Amino acid sequence: MNIVILAAGTGKRMRSALPKVLHPLAGRPLLSHVIATARTLQPSRLVVVVGHGAEQVQAAVAAPDVQFAVQAEQLGTGHAVRQALPLLDPAQPTLVLYGDVPLTRATTLKRLVDAAHDGRYGILTVTLDDPTGYGRIVRDAAGFVTRIVEQKDASPEQLKIAEINTGIIVTPTAQLSMWLGALKNENAQGEYYLTDVVELAIEAGFEIVTTQPDDDWETLGVNSKAQLAELERIHQRNVADALLVEGVTLADPARVDVRGTLRCGRDVSIDVNCVFEGDVTLADDVTVGPNCVIRNASIGAGTRIDAFTHIDGAQLGANTVIGPYARLRPGAQLADEAHVGNFVEVKNAVIGHGSKANHLTYIGDADIGARVNIGAGTITCNYDGANKFRTVIEDDVFVGSDTQLVAPVRVGRGVTIAAGTTVWKDVAEGTLALNEKTQTAKSGYVRPVKKKS
């Protein structure tokens, strides 16, 4: 089977410099959703017709299995499909999809393809309560499709028809070439419409078959930011419903966004206003508090993530405790039972089993062993303005508050570092590290007082 995806439109109503089909839905371009669905049908040829912003669109979705045809002039859907003909296998049927219709299920498309077997012409239709603006499917007394009539050309009787054309079709490819060549652009827009092919197929004696999607929203397209927002909410609610079926507890299914892939174990609980991006895995018994962002991360079983935590590119072991207001950046790796508390940032660092950094700390480019306590205000000074260096803290170290560790530096096993210490040399195992300081109390000191104006 050939699949052609039309993605050449300008999208003027989007009021954006970005090509319409590249606007994101759930974190991915609209066109990427359509291509992903198309791939599930295993086409022998997958062709995307580009036009407006062609180079940008091609760069965004380029892949070994995707070919591109260019529609240099915007002369209608029929003209667009004609540009793809040289790339199609004429012996196989062609399914035509749209790059701005991202939510059509693969099962819906397969049902249409199956119905159009043996050279039939298939149309995906939908019945709407309000079909205003759409082309109507006209049938004869026996129920056979005779034509598609556009809203502006419909008679009062035809305007009562609720079944409309979605534009998604399956057609014999060899005949399609002939039909497209016969199209005329005698309309107000001066364009060649793919819908006009239906009458040519009927005249040629081809049987027209129709199928419908399970849900009307599967055929909704995007022509404005308002429509994009509407489809985003439909998609996110579908994702939330699927999570609920899997046994995930959602505090409010309307207030969780998944912009990628979210895999959840048993008894996972997610509070409100959480966003999951990229590839995220939550193991059994993970609890995610409100207002968290988790991107490209693996979260171990029994972990608790408190409110307003941001996790990006991190790997967490089992029974860790994160947040509130913590930030784990790419390369952060936490072993089982590690704690990272409020206003702690971890980047490209390993934190060992049972180690804790509970408050106001920066840990970057570091290797921290097991059972280490990192006091409040500790900083690994890892950057000299040009190069990054690592800090190594071995097992059972106690780091006092307001400590600066100037990398590269190694702190041996069982070391205690006194509060307020700057460590710039390696510290031997089992010792106390401190900076000698003198504290003086001066009597008779008078604090300055502001003069009153």
From Swiss-Prot:
Record-listed Mg(2+) binding positions: D100, N223
Pfam families listed in its UniProt record: Hexapep, NTP_transf_3
GO biological process terms on file: cell morphogenesis; cell wall organization; lipid A biosynthetic process; peptidoglycan biosynthetic process; regulation of cell shape; UDP-N-acetylglucosamine biosynthetic process
Matches recorded under InterPro entries: Bifunctional_GlmU, GlmU-like, GlmU_C_LbH, Hexapep, Hexapep_transf_CS, MobA-like_NTP_Trfase, Nucleotide-diphossugar_trans, Trimer_LpxA-like_sf
Top-rank taxon: Bacteria
Cofactor note (record): Binds 1 Mg(2+) ion per subunit.
UniProt keyword Methyltransferase, yes or no: no
Reactions listed under catalytic activity: alpha-D-glucosamine 1-phosphate + acetyl-CoA = N-acetyl-alpha-D-glucosamine 1-phosphate + CoA + H(+); N-acetyl-alpha-D-glucosamine 1-phosphate + UTP + H(+) = UDP-N-acetyl-alpha-D-glucosamine + diphosphate
Region spans: N-acetyltransferase: 247-453
Gene3D superfamilies tied to this protein: Hexapeptide repeat proteins, Spore Coat Polysaccharide Biosynthesis Protein SpsA, Chain A
Binding site for UDP-N-acetyl-alpha-D-glucosamine: 6-9, 20, 71, 76-77, 98-100, 135, 150, 165, 223, 329, 347, 362, 373
Location in or out of the cell: Cytoplasm
Region (Pyrophosphorylase): 1-225
GO CC terms, sorted: cytoplasm; membrane
Principal location class: cytoplasm
EC number(s) on file: 2.7.7.23, 2.3.1.157
Record has Hydrolase as a keyword: no
Signal peptide extent: none
GO molecular function: glucosamine-1-phosphate N-acetyltransferase activity; magnesium ion binding; UDP-N-acetylglucosamine diphosphorylase activity
Protein function: Catalyzes the last two sequential reactions in the de novo biosynthetic pathway for UDP-N-acetylglucosamine (UDP-GlcNAc). The C-terminal domain catalyzes the transfer of acetyl group from acetyl coenzyme A to glucosamine-1-phosphate (GlcN-1-P) to produce N-acetylglucosamine-1-phosphate (GlcNAc-1-P), which is converted into UDP-GlcNAc by the transfer of uridine 5-monophosphate (from uridine 5-triphosphate), a reaction catalyzed by the N-terminal domain.
Full protein name: Bifunctional protein GlmU
Phylogenetic classification of the source organism: Bacteria, Pseudomonadati, Pseudomonadota, Betaproteobacteria, Burkholderiales
